[in-house]
Amino acid sequence: MNRFKKSKYVIIVFVTVLLVSALLATTYSSTIVTKLGDGISLVDRVVQKPFQWFDSVKSDLAHLTRTYNENESLKKQLYQLEVKSNEVESLKTENEQLRQLLDMKSKLQATKTLAADVIMRSPVSWKQELTLDAGRSKGASENMLAIANGGLIGSVSKVEENSTIVNLLTNTENADKISVKIQHGSTTIYGIIIGYDKENDVLKISQLNSNSDISAGDKVTTGGLGNFNVADIPVGEVVATTHSTDYLTREVTVKLSADTHNVDVIELVGNS
């Protein structure tokens, strides 16, 4: 009986030891696993950081590249729109000049007419001369007058086989002596263009054939006399009249009716 009790106690102690050992083992293993997991997680974060930074930089670069390409595309489109807009404005200006030339051509008594495009005009000599794409081969000749933008702008100074140089009225060294007539009411006074006043942007007319009154606003046209013999081309309007110190001669200043700055097409006119 005593032996049975001892065996029972031994079994209880053994089972208790097993349970305690199992509990301790489970707790220790859980702690190790937790610490090991924390360590692995830390290493993973450290390893992932450079890759995350690289991905972020890569994304930023891709965004910048897209933005740059979009800006370049927009700039190109804007440039193309500006070019087209300039082309349209240029065509409108040229068409208006052509309409004015056709209207004036129908009113002039000229036996020779020739339309030509401006192909060269140097900034250095912008107010002195320009070159046309038509020459002797197309009928251009000296003593022809040049009209554009509704009025007289100059005269032919040199003719080559395929080009013509026009001497502009705004050339301060112009010595072509084109005849003009001033209409004051029913009175017509003839004179000669003797130069250009660049300070006041006016033509100077002298050698008048009459002492008749001349007023500001009187119309001035070509006289049709001398070498340049096409009459009634609009020249401008009288601005003022001044007398010489001895009152024997008068000088008339005239505002040009034609814009000589912006010229694309010109009509050369003359009489054989």
Curated annotation (Swiss-Prot):
Keyword Membrane among record annotations: yes
Ranges per topology, Extracellular: 30-272
Residues exposed to the Cytoplasmic side: 1-8
Inactivation phenotype: Cell shape does not change, cells start autolysing earlier. Neither PBP2b (penA) nor rodA can be deleted when this gene is absent.
Keyword Membrane: yes
A GO cellular component entry from the record: plasma membrane
InterPro entries assigned to the protein according to its UniProt record, in alphabetical order: Cell/Rod_1, Cell/Rod_MreC_2, MreC, MreC_beta-barrel_core
Pfam families: MreC
Keyword line: Cell membrane, Cell shape, Coiled coil, Membrane, Transmembrane, Transmembrane helix
Record-annotated membrane-spanning stretches: 9-29
Membrane topology: Single-pass membrane protein
Purpose of the protein: Involved in formation and maintenance of cell shape, probably part of the elongasome which synthesizes peripheral peptidoglycan (PG).
Family statement drawn from the similarity comment of this UniProt entry: Belongs to the MreC family.
Name recorded for this polypeptide: Cell shape-determining protein MreC
Annotated source species: Streptococcus pneumoniae (strain ATCC BAA-255 / R6)
The organism's taxonomic lineage, starting at the top: Bacteria, Bacillati, Bacillota, Bacilli, Lactobacillales
